Regions:
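N-terminal secretory/targeting leader peptides
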Residues: 1-13, 22, 30-230
Length: 230
């Protein structure tokens, strides 16, 4: 969830890095917790949405309240930009927006469209500030109890499903965007490259606060940044 850790508008590069050694290292960190990480699945770039002013710079968040998942990273992100972070569960999100408990939120375009958040939000901002990912997990004891041929079949099926899901998302994304663009009273727009650079320049305090105390996290984030910069 670290803002602007992932490359802007470049899914192919994200896939290459997370399907490779660095993604495997992250999955290996899950070992010993009772579950195995089988793969990292793409869920789309997150948008900012608000029911207030347009967002073109970090300063535009001043005075806003933004719903977040219970997450120190997301809380630090919005507080760094001068907004109040309002933790709320996914099931509560629509009512939180409808009742004005929070001015806005962040989610991928398909989550916004399928849950009709465009009915209670007026600004939809493609910011490329973050990417939603999901990790497919298997119970370790169950997985290790399987014969080798079944383990191999599951691993192959996960890889196939992960890649097919990416294709399906890409095929549907334009339709979801069209749903938002055509919604009454909704303004959908993308940040300009110049605006994105201003946001990128603002987030270093978030990185420092969220990786402090963990040499592995600091090193891993640095290696991800280097890989995405290639």
């Amino acid at each position: 969830d670290l803002p602007y850790l992932m490359p802007v508008d470049n899914e192919k590069q994200i896939y290459e890095v997370l399907d490779g050694e660095l993604g495997g290292e992250l999955l290996n960190r899950i070992e010993g917790t009772g579950v195995n990480g089988l793969g990292i699945w793409y869920g789309g770039y997150k948008l900012f949405t608000t029911n207030g002013p347009e967002i073109h710079s970090p300063a535009d968040f001043q005075g806003l309240s933004m719903r977040v998942l219970p997450s120190s990273v997301l809380t630090a992100q919005y507080e760094n930009w001068g907004a109040e972070a309002v933790p709320a569960s996914y099931s509560e999100l629509y009512s939180v927006l409808e009742e004005g408990i929070a001015h806005g939120q962040e989610n991928p375009v398909q989550t916004i469209a399928l849950n009709c958040y465009q009915d209670v939000q007026s600004q939809m901002v493609q910011s490329y500030h973050g990417v939603m990912h999901y990790v497919l997990l298997a119970n370790t004891a169950w997985f290790e109890s399987l014969p080798e041929n079944m383990k191999e079949a599951i691993i192959e099926a996960e890889e196939y499903g992960r890649k097919e899901a990416r294709k399906a998302y890409a095929a549907q994304e334009a339709d979801y965007i069209a749903t938002l663009e055509s919604a009454e009273g909704v303004h959908y727009y993308e940040l300009t490259p110049e605006e994105i650079e201003v946001f990128k320049a603002s987030v270093q305090p978030v990185y420092e606060s969220q990786t402090a105390g963990s040499q592995w996290q600091m090193d891993y984030v640095k290696r991800l940044q280097e890989a995405f910069a290639e």
